[in-house]
């Protein structure tokens, strides 16, 4: 059977930085309060760029690092909860056009909120193993500043903009070992952007009620996330006869330091195994895991052959875990 490998990784963040001290001037909050509750010190905000721009810049670097020519990419899948356009075209199609791959390539979006990158891995893994595709570009890209209410201190402190991209290719080494994804739509109201879809079409009323922004029941989400992520990781480790000691790096979705620490302690991961970027990027939803992997890769921590365990939980609710060997035969070395 064909194997699928993550053969390149890249990320992009916009230049503007919004610090906690900047937010102190906008809402009733403080740097101390934000850091204590979330672990976030700053986040990047896109000005003059849209989601497809962010995704394109990460994608270009991922393709370069993979040593591939653009025509060798046969599929682009983008995970985003802040697409360029509500209905169409897909952000993936616009990224394809930006890359000059504007005819004949398979391109589509998925919506799995903060679990988006793990869903992307599962799709790409299946396409490669089935023989349907050879080189799949997966992109998690978010301009969350466009869907955040900067008068709501419970949410505006959390989110940032950015993109991460990876190439998944057919390979005989460093394979994606296992992926688990799941969902529970019965609790979707706890983390939701209510407006601008068919449930509450855009109107003066929905805009006045700020239904076009992210709404979150933070305490409930925290409890469910910790329980669900812990169970998800335990299941995937047991399914593969592994423990936390078989993992080189634990790369969680960067949502909130308290969630990460709670899950880490329950799973017995050591500090040196954990990849954390939340302090400088905040929560970038579907982009957070590839951005974190790329940071650890560029700093020399994650290397070709490293065993990674990824986990994420997001709106929907969606969640998932993945175990993979990082890199491949032609992996780009910094």
Curated annotation (Swiss-Prot):
EC id: 2.3.1.180
One cellular component (GO) term of this entry: cytoplasm
Enzyme's top EC category: transferase
SUPFAM superfamilies for the chain: Thiolase-like
Location of the region described as ACP-binding in the Swiss-Prot/TrEMBL record: 254-258
Annotated catalytic residues: 114, 253, 283
Gene Ontology biological-process entries: fatty acid biosynthetic process; secondary metabolite biosynthetic process
UniProt-annotated location(s): Cytoplasm
InterPro entries: ACP_syn_III_C (IPR013747), ACP_syn_III_N (IPR013751), FabH (IPR004655), Thiolase-like (IPR016039)
Pathway, per record: Lipid metabolism; fatty acid biosynthesis
One of the record's GO molecular function terms: 3-oxoacyl-[acyl-carrier-protein] synthase activity
UniProt KW keywords: Acyltransferase, Cytoplasm, Fatty acid biosynthesis, Fatty acid metabolism, Lipid biosynthesis, Lipid metabolism, Multifunctional enzyme, Transferase
Catalytic activity field: malonyl-[ACP] + acetyl-CoA + H(+) = 3-oxobutanoyl-[ACP] + CO2 + CoA
Function statement: Catalyzes the condensation reaction of fatty acid synthesis by the addition to an acyl acceptor of two carbons from malonyl-ACP. Catalyzes the first condensation reaction which initiates fatty acid synthesis and may therefore play a role in governing the total rate of fatty acid production. Possesses both acetoacetyl-ACP synthase and acetyl transacylase activities. Its substrate specificity determines the biosynthesis of branched-chain and/or straight-chain of fatty acids.
Subunit structure of this chain's protein: Homodimer.
Family note: Belongs to the thiolase-like superfamily. FabH family.
NCBIfam families, alphabetized: fabH, PRK09352.1
Free-text note on domains in this protein's UniProt record: The last Arg residue of the ACP-binding site is essential for the weak association between ACP/AcpP and FabH.
UniProt protein name: Beta-ketoacyl-[acyl-carrier-protein] synthase III
Gene for this chain: fabH
């Amino acid at each position: 059977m064909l194997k699928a490998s993550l053969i390149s990784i890249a990320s992009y963040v916009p230049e503007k930085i919004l610090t906690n001290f900047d937010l102190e001037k906008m809402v009733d909050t403080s740097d101390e309060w934000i850091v204590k509750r979330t672990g976030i010190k700053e986040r990047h905000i896109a000005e003059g760029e849209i989601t497809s721009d962010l995704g394109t810049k990460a994608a270009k670097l991922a393709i370069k690092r993979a040593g591939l020519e653009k025509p060798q990419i046969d599929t682009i899948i983008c995970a985003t909860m802040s697409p360029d356009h509500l209905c169409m075209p897909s952000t993936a199609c616009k990224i394809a056009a930006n890359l000059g791959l504007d005819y004949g390539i398979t391109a589509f979006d998925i919506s799995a909120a903060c679990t988006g990158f793990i869903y992307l891995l599962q799709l790409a893994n299946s396409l490669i193993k089935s023989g349907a595709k050879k080189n799949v570009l997966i992109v998690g890209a978010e301009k969350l500043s466009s869907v955040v209410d900067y008068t709501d201190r419970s949410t505006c402190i959390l989110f940032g903009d950015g993109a991460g991209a990876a190439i998944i290719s057919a390979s005989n080494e460093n394979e994606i070992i296992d992926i688990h994804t799941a969902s529970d739509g019965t609790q979707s109201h706890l983390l939701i952007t209510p407006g601008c879809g068919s449930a509450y079409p855009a109107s003066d009323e929905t805009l006045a009620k700020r239904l076009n922004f992210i709404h979150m029941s933070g305490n409930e989400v925290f409890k469910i996330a910790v329980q669900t992520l812990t169970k998800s990781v335990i299941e995937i480790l047991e399914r593969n006869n592994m423990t936390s000691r078989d993992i080189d790096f634990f790369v969680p979705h960067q949502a909130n330091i308290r969630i990460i620490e709670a899950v880490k302690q329950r799973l017995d991961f050591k500090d040196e195994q954990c990849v954390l970027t939340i302090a400088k990027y905040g929560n970038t939803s579907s982009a957070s895991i590839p951005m974190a992997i790329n940071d650890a890769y560029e700093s020399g921590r994650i290397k070709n052959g490293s065993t990674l365990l990824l986990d994420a939980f997001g709106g929907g609710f969606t969640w998932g875990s993945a175990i993979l060997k990082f890199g491949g035969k032609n992996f780009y070395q910094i």
